[in-house]
């Protein structure tokens, strides 16, 4: 859905296949469906599309104007990209990019479900609700094996239930 470059004003540009995201959102909502989108706090997403780095407010405003209901915000693409982070081993360096986007999302009149994806690093279940995220990935990616499903879906989740509550959930992938 995303173009290779942003618009001259810095807002997200769409590609020729998805020329009107607001109309798409309206179409989905008219049918009782929700509208979700994917981005990253980095320069690029996992798929090498544009991330939200240094455009968080513009992107939050754009998501609101399109009628977005769900944002998956994926660490992939962020990594070591932001020059203001002094130490990657501090929990604060993992919280900062998510808290920054969350503040901009909460300024919007639309309620956007905020899903953090950073693969359980720095025990996100301990701070995800603190930054008012709705869900957070607790593990790495699942694979198409019973062993992976069992490990991620059951073994690694058993002690995390205390961190889930209404409006805030563990996401085992």
Indicate residue ranges for each PLM-predicted region.
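Extracellular/periplasmic catalytic domains that process cell-envelope and extracellular macromolecules
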Residues: 28-30, 64-65, 106-109, 128-130, ...
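Residue-level detector of functional hotspots within protein domains
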Residues: 54-57, 61, 91, 100, ...
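Extracytoplasmic, non-cytosolic globular domains
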Residues: 67-70, 75-78, 83, 87-120
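Generic structural hydrophobic/aromatic packing signal, biased to beta-strands
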Residues: 35, 63, 101, 114-116, ...
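Generic recognition of stable, solvent-exposed alpha-helical segments in well-folded globular domains
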Residues: 19, 23, 58, 93-96, ...
């Amino acid at each position: 859905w995303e173009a290779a470059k942003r618009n001259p004003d810095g807002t997200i540009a769409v590609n020729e296949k998805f020329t009107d995201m607001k109309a798409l959102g309206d179409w989905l909502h008219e049918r009782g469906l929700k509208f979700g989108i994917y981005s990253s706090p980095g320069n690029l997403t996992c798929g090498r599309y544009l991330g939200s780095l240094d455009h968080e407010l513009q992107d939050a405003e754009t998501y609101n104007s399109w009628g977005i209901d769900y944002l998956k915000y994926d660490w992939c693409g962020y990594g070591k990209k932001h020059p203001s982070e002094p130490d990657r081993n501090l929990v604060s360096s993992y919280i900062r990019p998510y808290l920054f986007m969350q503040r901009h999302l909460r300024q919007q009149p639309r309620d956007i479900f905020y899903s953090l994806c950073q693969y359980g690093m720095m025990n996100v279940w301990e701070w995800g609700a603190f930054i008012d995220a709705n869900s957070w990935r607790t593990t790495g990616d699942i694979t198409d094996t019973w062993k992976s499903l069992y490990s991620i879906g059951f073994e690694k989740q058993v002690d995390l239930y205390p961190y889930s509550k209404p409006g805030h959930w563990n996401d085992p992938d």
